[in-house]
Amino acid sequence: GLVVSSVVGMFEHVVAELTIVMCFQSLILDMAGNVGTQSLAVTIRVLMDENLTAGQKVHLVFKEARVGLSNGLILGMMSIILIGCYIYFFKSGSLQFAFAVSGCIGAALILAMLISSLVGTLIPMFFHKIHIDPAVASGPLITTVNDLVAVVTYYGLAWFFLIEILHY
């Protein structure tokens, strides 16, 4: 919690310039957490039920990454459209601003969900490799890592695209 709060504090200037991005922080964090936890559960189940070869582990990583990317693309595209319309119609922003912000949110969702699915797969594999029960050790770590990934992805994209490139 303290580490994630410190990282959010590093992006204070982004929130000060674009307060609207704060409204959608929980969307990014929650979806990244959901995807990471799902990948974690699938991976732990597979690791406990089967003796996997290196090739099967690589296949599992790519499978979970595809799932995370697919879900991210679907939710990211929906977010671009729905949040863009919401900002435009209810927050009285220009059309360009509304869809720039929603595009940033959509991109952050795609990236955060992809990275979180990879992290949710790789962390239990690491613990399994070093003979620590991944079911016990992975939970707290995956939550913190996914929150960090989501915060850095979201506010990093907001800073880079919305402030540095588009100058909002």
Residue spans for each PLM region:
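Alpha-helical transmembrane segments and their membrane-interface boundaries
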Residues: 1-118, 122-134, 144, 157-168
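Alpha-helical transmembrane segments that form the membrane-embedded catalytic/substrate-binding core
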Residues: 143-154
